[in-house]
C-alpha cells in the first residue's frame, strides 16, 4: 500500500469493520478521528499483528483455492475409466426379477463395508472389483470395525458415470450406487430416525413414476466428459463427513455390479414409518424405494412444480440431492430439505416441500415480549423502565434523554406531541416536561441541580471546591469577613465610610448603594492590631440576590437598623439570609442621635425574629451607634471581633491553590473585565490560571481597595483581579487550575449548561390547547440590558422579570451584558424590535447615531427603581385596552313608519340622556333584552339629519335590527377605555 493506510482500507484488509478498528486504535492510545483518517506505518503494523484472524483468513483462502484446483485435476488424471469398466462384470439387459437369486452372498457384508469406506474414501484412489462395495448403506451409521478391504471400494462406484462408458447405446443407469448412500442395505429397524443426517434424504421419499427400461435411458455423457455430473438433484451441497464422503474422481469406479450382486428389495413392511408418507411436493405417486437390479435408485416423483420430496430425482439415499448411481435427471424442485443442506435455490425458486418455520431463539422471544409490554403513547412504542432513576441536567433535550434510555429521539418527540407538548429533539426542555415523559415510560427523572452538576464537572478534572487541603497543622488564622446588611437608607454605607474614613456614599446615585463593595481595614483590640474584611451590600429590594451572596461569602453579619424607623421588610430579609447561611449577627442600632429614636423598641421588635439581646438573656450583641456622629464605632468593632473569636474557627490553609468567590465584576474600558474577588482559602498569585463561572483567564494584575498592586492575596483578602477573557458573574466561585486548557474546558462546559438552562427557562411552553392563541399576534416587550457591573445587571433583570403583569404581555430579556452600549446591541435591538436599557453606562462610538437611524429606543438610568417604574408603565401600555360601558340615554319608540328604500323607521321620544348617531344601543322589550348590540344607523330631527338628540325631543331613527315594535326601548351606550391601575 503506497503512502499511509487509511482506517477503512485496513479494516477491509483485516476483515473487520471500521468501527471495531477505531475502537482498537482507541484502546491502543492512538487518536484517529474517523474511518477516512490515515495511520502511520508502525501503527498499521501493530494493527496487523493484533488481528491474527487476518492471517488465518489468508491461509484459509489459499487452502480453499487449492482444493478446487486439485479436484478437477483428478478427473482428467485418471486414465483408467475405460479400462476399468470393461474389466468388471457389466450387466446387459436386466431380467425382470433378478433380485431373489443374488442377495445371499453380499447381504452380510453390506452394512459394514460402506460405512467404513466413508472416512477412507478420499485416500483410496485404486478401485477394487468387489461387488459388495457398491451396495448403498445407511449414511448415518459409521462402522469403525469395517474391513480395510472395503475402504478403497467406496469411491469406485460413483466414479464411473463422470467419464461415461465406452460401449454405445444410451443406458439409464450407467453409474454404480455410491457407497454409503443406500438406506436399505441394512435392516430398517436399525435406523434410529427417519432422517439419518441433516443433508440426507428420506429413504423412498422420492416421488417417481416407473423406472425407465434398460434401453430407454437418456443419452450418456460423451467419453472423456468428466466435468458436469448428470445427477438429478445437482446443485445441492456435498454431503457432510460421515455421509458417504466426497465424490471420487471419474474413472476410478469399480466394475459395474451384476443383477445378481444386488441386495434384495426390502418389502414395504420393513420401511420406516415416515418413508411411506407422500412427498410434500405432491403431484404424483411416491417414488420407488430403489435398490432394483442394476443399482438404479428410486425415480423422482410425479408432479412438475416442487417435484417431490427432498432429494427427488437423486439416487436412493443420495444426501441432499447428490448424484446417484443411476437414473435420469430429476424433476425440478429437487434438492435437500428446505433450510438445510442441499437446499440451494434453483431457477424455479426455493426447493420443493412445505416451508417449515424455525424455532425462535430466547432472545427473539424476549424482545417480542418486551415490545408487547412496552408503553405506547399515541401509537408510539417507547422503552419501558422498571422505575430506574435517570439523571438529567437542567435544560436537557430529548436527544439527551434518548441517549440515557437507548431510545429513538423521534419517538420521544412524537410521544410528547401526543401528550400535548410541541418540542424538537434538540430543544431544551423544562423539568416538568421531562418528568411527565419519564413517568409515561415508568422512569424516575431526576433533574440534577446546578450545584451537583458543577461538582460532577469538577470531579471529572480531579478538582474540589470548598475544602481546605492538608491537615490541622497546615491551617493558619485569617481575618474575619463581615457583611453589613439592613434596610435601605438605614446608614450601612455611612457606617462603612466612618470605619474606612472615606466617603463612598456621595458617589452612589440616589444616595443608595447599587454595588457590593469589599474593603479590608485595620482595627485594634486589646492592644493588638487586627484585620477585618467588610462587605457592603445594597438594601434596596431589587438587590436580594446580592444580599444572599454577601451572606454566603461572610463569616459574620452586622445588621444595621435605624432607631427611628424600626424593623423594615429588607431588615427581615437580611435576617433570613444571615440565618439561612448560619452566620452570627451583631445588631448595630443606628441614628440614636435623631429625635424619636427608641433603641429599646428595636430590641423588642428583633426578639420576634430570634435575635434576643444579651441584656434580655440572649446571645446577640446590640450596640447603639451613630454613624453620622461617629459614636460607639470602636465598641461595634470590638463586639464584632469578640463574636468572631467566640463562635467561629477562622483558619485556612494559605499554601494550597486559591479558591474564592467573585463578589462583583464589571467591564473597564482600559483594563477589560475586572472582578472583585474574595479569597477564602489558599493564596492567589499573579500568573495563576483561574476560572470563575463561565469566565476564565490568567491573573495579569491584582489591585487592592486603595488602587495599589498586590502580588499575592492571602485568605480573607479582597482584591480586584484583571485578566479574565470575559466578565464573570457575581457570586461565581473562583478556582485556580493547573493550566489554561483545563480552565477553558471548564468554562465552556459551564457556559453550555447555563445556555441550555436559560433556554429551557425562557421558552414558553406551547401546548396544543393554546396553539391557536400562540399563533396569533401577541404583545411582547424585548429588552437589552447593559450595566456597569454584573451584579447590577443581575439585580435589574430579576426586578424587571418580577413585575406583575397580565398574561397577554410578555417581557423577554434577549441580551444582557456589562459595559457600554455598542453597535452590536443596536443591530440586535433593530432586528428584534427591542428597547435598550443602559444602567450607569452610555452608548459607545457611533451607537447613538446608528440607533437614531434605525429607530431604536435607548433609555439611560442611574437609579434602579426609575427603570423598574418606566418598564412597568411600558408593559401596561402594551396590554389590550379595557373598556367599560357608559350609558348615554334612552328612547322609547312611539310610532312606526315603513319606507321602501330604508325599511322600518322608528319615531322615538328621548326619555333620558341623549341619543347619538352611529352609537351602540340595546333593544329592550317588556324589560327583556331582544337585541344586545344594535347600531343607530341614521338619526333625524324633523327632516334634518342630526348627530345627537337630547332628552325631551322627538326624533326618527333607523337601526340595524328589523324586528322593532311600538313600545320598545332603545338604550344607547358607548364603550370607553378604562385606565389600568
UniProtKB/Swiss-Prot annotation:
Chief localisation class: cytoplasm
User: Which superkingdom?
Assistant: Bacteria
> For bias kind Pro residues, which ranges apply?
88-111, 136-145, 256-269
Record's compositionally biased regions (Low complexity):
64-87, 112-121, 146-165, 270-279
User: Residues annotated as region G5?
Assistant: 626-628
The record's subcellular location field reads: Cytoplasm
Protein name as annotated = Translation initiation factor IF-2
Which species does the entry assign this protein to? Rhodococcus erythropolis (strain PR4 / NBRC 100887)
Name of the coding gene: infB
